Design a protein with these regions (language model features):
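Surface-exposed loop and turn segments in beta-propeller and other repeat-based domains
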Residues: 3, 38-61, 93-114
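Beta-propeller domains
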Residues: 1-6, 19-48
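Short loop/turn segments that connect beta-strands within beta-propeller blades
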Residues: 34-36, 89-92
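Short coil/turn segments that connect the beta-strands within blades of beta-propeller domains
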Residues: 17-18, 72-74
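Structural signal for beta-propeller blades
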Residues: 28-30, 83-87
Length: 114
């Protein structure tokens, strides 16, 4: 059982089937449901029907991610600090995929607070 208090400043959440992503202060944690483990959770056997287990962590820095969604192209999130929508990038903190036309440049300035 993953409790909200075990994530540092959770702000964004995406759920799609057995996948879940949680945006925290400095990272995005990807979890997967392991329903076969839930009934045997040691502290309260027979209580739960889902158990989301952390599978990977993407260290993105303090992007202030407020919302996310799983798409056919991968996880897309709202990057409030850089005023854009983004996808995770294995080499960089993020890859911008859209910004409002009135935002002249990507900068860590929260220019429009998406």
């Amino acid at each position: 059982i993953q409790l909200p208090r075990t994530f540092e400043e959770p702000m964004g959440l995406a759920i799609d089937g057995d996948r879940m992503a949680v945006a925290t202060k400095h990272s995005i944690v990807l979890l997967a449901n392991e329903p076969c483990l839930a009934p045997t959770y040691p502290r309260q056997p027979g209580t739960y029907d889902a158990l989301y287990v952390p599978r990977s962590v993407h260290f993105a820095g303090a992007l202030a991610v407020h919302d996310m969604v799983f798409t056919d192209q991968g996880l897309v999130g709202v990057n409030t600090l850089f005023s854009c929508l983004f996808q995770l990038d294995p080499r960089h903190s993020f890859r911008p995929v859209w910004k409002p036309p009135f935002v002249s440049a990507l900068a860590p300035e929260d220019r429009c607070h998406l």
